[in-house]
């Protein structure tokens, strides 16, 4: 199974005021890489950690709110040690305490619509059977609290980095454009 090509960002827009649409992109050697997500805010909630957190340890998070977070790449990538062919994917994070794993999933659609990030019971829509793979992220404590989720891409030459910043956490993973 391969990823569906050319997801349309306008199909992912919800007009949500609580978790506004956000995007990060980088161009490497003429190839576009972008991530589209909905950015929730902390709003005096405990986001990560123990059982009282919105995203407790040991859960899978959709890396945002509303629709599942989407990665588009015009080039083959190696994210840390994970080979990612050009195409479109959904991104999740396995929150295992102080060590997160980035999940790259091949499922983009639920029937005729883009996949929502969670089910009605609050569990994730990530399906392990359709995962391309998982790779470790480098964790650090944020220098100061980050109120609204921020995902960013940066690159120098063919090497780049994806950075996730939210609440008191930063998580990053390197990538190489093939």
Residue ranges and their predicted role:
Residues 1-5:
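N-terminal export/membrane-targeting signals
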Residues 6-56, 108-178:
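Primarily secretory-pathway and cell-envelope proteins
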Residues 61-116:
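Mid-length scaffold segments of soluble, non-membrane domains
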